[in-house]
Amino acid sequence: MLALFLGSLSLIPFLLIVCTAFLKIAMTLLITRNAIGVQQVPPNMALYGIALAATMFVMAPVAHDIQQRVHEHPLELSNADKLQSSLKVVIEPLQRFMTRNTDPDVVAHLLENTQRMWPKEMADQANKNDLLLAIPAFVLSELQAGFEIGFLIYIPFIVIDLIVSNLLLALGMQMVSPMTLSLPLKLLLFVLVSGWSRLLDSLFYSYM
């Protein structure tokens, strides 16, 4: 039992990605960098570090609640039934977080798929609170939300690219790369509107 528990600790990086805010935050930061046009600044490691720090901020209340429950319901490694019962109580805050930030349409779609793909006895018992449904539904919802945010982020930067391209064309300066002028303008716009702060604030508020 102890070996099983220690082995489960190796799943922590996986759970960090699929059960927390990390996926959407990291996606949004990477899409923002690509939208601006600076492919390697900040570097991937820096963006993942920012995403991890932001995830810790978002997940702090959930982690605090889990910590409190661990103190109230110590994990009994010597008894499988007690361990399962304790784990169910301990992970409830995380499951509540995922459910709160999951698109109901995604849950309904997955429930429909269980009727087609799972054995009848499993499908009949499936409900939206099962971790087997909650985790993939949360991941799909985060992916969808991340791409929606990315689309909105791209719009102003595409407008700048179009304006610069048309301006150069009108001036007969086709030999000048539009990126040469649009990149500084996009960086200036992002700095003037406090882009990083506003972006992270929007991500934080999306989990309220």
From Swiss-Prot:
Sorted UniProt keywords: Cell membrane, Hypersensitive response elicitation, Membrane, Transmembrane, Transmembrane helix
Keyword Transmembrane helix in record: yes
Biological process, per Gene Ontology: protein secretion; symbiont-mediated perturbation of host programmed cell death
Keyword Chloroplast: no
Segments traversing the membrane: 2-22, 46-66, 149-169, 176-196
Cellular component aspect of the GO annotation: plasma membrane
Cellular localization per UniProt: Cell membrane
Principal location class: membrane
UniProt superkingdom: Bacteria
Membrane topology label: Multi-pass membrane protein
Similarity annotation: Belongs to the FliP/MopC/SpaP family.
Function: Required for the secretion of harpin.
Protein name, UniProt field: Harpin secretion protein HrpW
Organism: Pseudomonas syringae pv. syringae
